[in-house]
């Protein structure tokens, strides 16, 4: 009898039901039986069905050896109600199946359960808040996109280092992170981790993301005691004092210092019944209705114990703090009772471990819509929780560290240079559009050369630069972008035209300076012969 492992994913409970029904119909031994002087072919007794199906479920890795015979009978009752089987006279539709010699058979056809139909979803990538995100409330439609081809001035700023200018840097504080931003980061990264562990393309069919409260996650991480138990801000949501005292009594048995009532024979059974009654009358299971599919999906990972523990850790972070606290206290009590050798038997028909699972599985996990396998799935989950509750109900440090580093990074200052992305002003909004392969090849080949050519022309025509500075920049440009430079100056003659040789100036005649300049009306001696 081989039961395929049903992995994590949407509708896992329905997939398990269909898998079990198919295997039961295909493998259940059928033979001839007599009843009231009449023979019936291809049928089986109720007891034979219970024996065979019980062994199948116990050997299945989807359910495990903790499945009881009583649970198997409950499942066969649901088989009878859903017309998976019928009695030998063709009656079905009610859960009157009992573990006896009554005869049953398979109907000609046994329709499998259909999967719930949901509208197709678009695969949305969980988005983390970024530095440049617009403030909350800004429309996300038609957000301008940076132009693909920059103008020469922007390119000049970007590549100023290549032509010899290093601009001064400055520190820029990004937009202040609000409390809502931080909460959204916690929610987004937590769900992203869960999605990655489950190996799903989307959590939409496993979890209603809108019902996930980021405040619960943050509270469950930081508001904890030294023992790791959640501390509630609202004390009205605490366990009643009498329930907490009863749980401490059984957890510390036989040292019950909290209870002042005198002990009597069977006292521990009454205390246990009090605790079971309180948890059994909760309005909602501790793992909540809306997280049922998420926890059932994680059950498909139990073959990889470490991965399953990580997935359960994250799922338990999504719980309301009061539910997480009640679950922590309950699991600690259950584990201590099972390990306590001095504890008297709490039930004559079951062992202590089986009793814990059967008593509390439904108040821990159940479906709002009464899924047919929810009892078996809940028992499987509670068994795993009891064995690993200390790890599962701890805060996952890897996730906490990653989120804290992310928040710190967004709050950190950043070094920016003039002309970097944040300084680009868009002349007109442009939007992404699909281009042809030919246009892509052209942009890849020539898209970057046009701004460089324009930049080179600006250097050439810049009248503010001296010839020496201009030659220096052109030499650096030639070294950085030889193809563009070669296209502009294909020959040495074309380069020489840029710097024509100036004619050498003629040397000026030196005039002798007179020692004594002429004075006005100065009389001169006449020489007569």
Swiss-Prot record:
Any one of the GO BP annotations: positive regulation of Wnt signaling pathway
- Please give the superkingdom of this protein's source: Eukaryota
Instruction: Establish whether keyword Ion transport is in the entry.
Output: no
**Residue numbers carrying Phosphoserine:** 160, 436
Q: Which SMART domains match?
A: DEP
Which Pfam family would be a valid example here? Answer: RhoGAP
Q: Where is this site: Arginine finger?
A: 231
Domain DEP, first and last residues per copy: 24-108
Give UniProt keywords alphabetically: GTPase activation, Phosphoprotein
Describe the location of the Rho-GAP domain by residue ranges. 201-393
Question: Molecular function terms in GO for this entry?
Answer: GTPase activator activity
Spell out the PANTHER family in the cross-references.
DEP DOMAIN-CONTAINING (PTHR16206), DEP DOMAIN-CONTAINING PROTEIN 1B (PTHR16206:SF11)
UniProt name for this protein: DEP domain-containing protein 1B
